[in-house]
Amino acid sequence: MRTVTLTKGVPDFREGQVSFDEDGHLERGDTPTVMNPNDEPALRASLQAKVRNGGTASVMSMGPPGYGDVLREAMESVYADDLYLLSDREMAAADTWATAITVATGIQNMDEEPDLVFAGFKTADGETGHTGPQTAWCLDWPLVTHVVALDVDTEAGTLRAKRLVEGDADEIETVEAPLPAFVVTDPEFEPSYRRAEHRLTHKDLREETRQRAGEHEDHMTVWDHSDLNLDPDFIGLDGSPTIVSGVDPIPKAPAERDATMVDPSDPEEMAGVVDEMSRFAGGD
């Protein structure tokens, strides 16, 4: 069995500053790039499939050459066998639709059709959640979203998934789909390794991946638009039908503090402060 996990590099909003140009496009400046945190459940799902069903795991991303570090991190997370980076200027500034076209073409260009493609439910910089479903549409594959648990039957060529019903976090439905299929994981996804052999396989794969991740560039294939035979008019900024009408900062609510002024020279008031602090600290 072969799986592909899609991941993306996003600005580390804890470090540096980002801005937007006059067309509403994100300018990262010197802000560091990190792996999209919402991709982690997808990586866990792919790792579970590899441990329990065998086969190979690949990771694919679209972005600038600097995304190699993001792919290395993903390789360590999913114990990936190989990496794919889709990268050139023609692909830059793509919206979700142009991204989906590019990524779907990259998947179709692989030497072997994968059985499963995994994606996180949204990116930290875009927040739309469109790219995964749109990529599934371009591939013309079954799509299962909000997945929290997964079992794959390679002999039957099917997957059985538990998914959260949108709008009701307490309701879970079980669905079945034929392979190949596209899976969008929910943040609540947790892998399951019920058998001892699965846990041993997990340990062995971790040891194998340590050396491979240290030489991740030797296991990375980089494709530009010409390698994928993509028309520049249908990818990147030129192929993006989305128009950003404006970008507005989210106003921060004013901090509310319920403060009490005390006289530090008044023993009774200070004793009251000590009592109050003791209550918060778990005292009597």
What are these language model-derived features?
Residues 1-62:
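N-terminal beta-strand-loop-alpha-helix module at the start
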Residues 5, 59-61, 85, 119, ...:
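Structural beta-sheet core signal
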Residues 13-15, 39-43, 67-69, 125-131:
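Short glycine/serine/threonine-rich phosphate/pyrophosphate-binding segments
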Residues 69-102, 106:
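A glycine-rich helix N-cap at a beta->alpha junction
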Residues 81, 115, 180:
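Conserved acidic residues
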Residues 107-115:
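Glycine-rich phosphate-binding loop signature in dinucleotide/nucleotide-binding domains
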Residues 126-146:
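Short Gly/Thr/Asp-enriched flexible loops that form oxyanion-binding sites at enzyme active sites
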Residues 149-284:
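Electrostatically charged, flexible surface regions
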